[in-house]
A protein has these predicted regions:
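Low-complexity, acidic/polar, glycine-enriched regions of mature
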Residues: 17-182
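Sec-dependent N-terminal signal peptides
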Residues: 4-13
Length: 182
C-alpha cells in the first residue's frame, strides 16, 4: 500500500513537470575569483547550453544539466582570456567543454557533478526558482533559475601553479537562466 501511494505521488509530481528551453540571450554563466587577494575578476562563458525539466508549481527540478564552451571564456581582457584557455589553466584544446549534471534537487539545493579539465567533482548550488511566470510581450510561460556555488579551482587542476595570493583558489559560480516552457 505504501509503495502504491509513493508511486502515485511520484507520478502526479512528474505529470506537472515540463521541459524548458534556455533563452541564451537573457541568460548567463558567470564566475568570480580573487585577483591579488583584494580585487575580483569576473568572467562569463559566452557559449553554453543546457536542459531543464521542472515542475513550475512546486519549483522542483527533475532534470538540470548544461555544458559550457571553454573557448568562449570572456573576462573583458583578451590577453588574460587567451592565457586562461592554455594548458596552464582550462586547457581548452584538450578539454573544450565543461559540464554539470544534477544528481539531486532538494530544498533549494542543486546537487550535481561538475566536470572541468576532465575532472569530475560533486558540487552543491544554492538555487532560487521563480515560476510559473508569463512574458508580458508574447504571453509565453517561462521560469527564472538563479543558482550559485563555490569551487576550489585547484581541485580541477586549473592554474595549479598559481598561488592563492595571485589567483584565488575559491571560485564563485553564478547562473542566471531564463527558460521558456516547451
Amino acid at each position: 500500500m505504501k509503495k502504491a501511494l509513493m508511486f502515485t505521488l511520484l507520478g502526479v509530481s512528474l505529470a506537472f513537470a515540463k521541459p524548458y528551453t534556455i533563452d541564451k540571450a537573457n541568460s548567463s554563466v558567470w564566475f568570480e575569483v580573487k585577483h591579488f587577494k583584494f580585487n575580483e575578476t569576473r568572467g562569463v562563458f559566452d557559449s553554453f547550453d543546457g536542459k531543464i525539466d521542472a515542475d513550475p508549481n512546486t519549483k522542483a527540478l527533475n532534470i538540470f544539466e548544461g555544458k559550457i564552451d571553454i573557448k568562449s571564456i570572456n573576462t573583458r581582457n583578451k590577453k588574460r582570456d587567451d592565457h586562461l584557455r592554455t594548458a596552464e589553466f582550462f586547457d581548452a584544446m584538450k578539454y573544450p567543454k565543461g559540464s554539470f549534471k544534477m544528481t539531486k534537487y532538494e530544498d533549494g539545493k542543486i546537487h550535481g557533478d561538475l566536470t572541468l579539465r576532465g575532472v569530475t567533482k560533486p558540487v552543491v548550488l544554492e538555487a532560487k526558482i521563480q515560476a510559473p511566470l508569463q512574458n508580458p510581450m508574447n504571453k509565453k510561460e517561462f521560469m527564472v533559475l538563479q543558482a550559485e556555488g563555490k569551487i576550489n579551482r585547484k581541485d580541477f587542476g586549473i592554474g595549479k601553479t598559481f598561488s592563492d595570493a595571485v589567483v584565488g583558489d575559491e571560485v564563485k559560480i553564478e547562473l542566471k537562466l531564463e527558460a521558456y516552457a516547451q
